[in-house]
Amino acid sequence: MSGYCRGRSQFPSIPGAGCRLGWGLLLPIRALFMETSLLLSMAGFALAMSITPGPVNLVALGSGARHGFAASLRHVVGATLGFILLLLLMGLGLGATLLQWPAAAELLRWGGVIFLGWMAWQLLVDSSRVEGVDGVAPSFWYGALMQWLNPKAWLAASMGMGAYGSAGGVGQAALFSGLYLVICLCSIACWAYAGSPLQGLLLVPPR
């Protein structure tokens, strides 16, 4: 290989200079390609977990239909930041801590079951009340708490940090969290915006 490089050198006085120059140009391109592939993989995972139907997104849809898009932004922001906090704590070792405290993990598991049961009951009894209590738009803290009782959020946080955060160190975990924040915020906002056109229909009094 070294003979081939010396034979193809563009600088006869410097053996292998052409080969080294070629590799020097290829290495940044290869690094850029790998970085882009990683970012696309992160974004694809975050989008798949954020945009698909779930309790938080259904609440955003119902809130948009009942109260409009602007009033639903508190829930959107609260749910986003609540999940990002969960994601960061998973990256800092929350999952390993819960494995050492089975009682805490069991408490969270049953809290999620009760929460999903309550959501199903609200949908069954009165779908117009799914987004809050007494016709009030869901608050910031309501959205944040929902994520901590949402099994889908726990699954996404554990899988995401396991795939992209743990092996890459603090920098990659922070990059993943920042990217997830933007995608999660936009995804939940899309559900709230999708429900807002229905607001006028819900406000029409029955004849």
Task: Name each model feature, range by range.
Residues V56, G82, L86-L94, L116-M119, ...:
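Alpha-helical transmembrane segments and their lipid-water interface positions
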Residues V125-P138:
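Flexible cytoplasmic inter-helical loops of multi-pass small-molecule transporters
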